[in-house]
Amino acid sequence: MSSNVPPTFTELLSRCTRSAIHLEMRDSYAVDYEHGPFAEWRAGARLDPDDRASWWRPWLDLIQETVGRGVVVRRARIVSEPVSEYTKFLYDGTFTNVAAGEQVRWLPRRRASDIALPGNDFWLFDKQTIHWNHFTGDGASAGGEVSNEPASAKLCAEAFEEAWSRAVPHDEYEIH
């Protein structure tokens, strides 16, 4: 059953003690906070891995603190190939997630055809609490939803682990 007054995402991550897994299944997102960086990237701007001060942000502090507490943070991205322009943008910036301690893998969608996947992207905390990420057809955020439904948590955990086992680590994945 979903909560009427869900905790914030930061609270969920802060309460997490063992694992935080994130499955992304869209080829494009239109979330507000990425409009500027995506436009700059499309114009040719790239982050300089050696200039940490230019790209470090509060999100990365949160991930670094979480990993520092012993929580394993993993993200799997299921992507169509050839990848979308937006996926190229994500790929180019993923080194920041890795620098914060997040493990990231990429799964070509063709290799995910026989995986039973939930209908929405999600975060799953300690194999129990789900934060569903809802999006509009155009990729804008339509809000989140928190659930502790055991069957849904099991589906998410199993889908993620199967995707993770087939996915390519970020440092080995080549954009196609």
Map each language-model feature to its residues.
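PLD/PLD-like phosphodiesterase catalytic module centered on the HKD motif
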Residues: 1-176
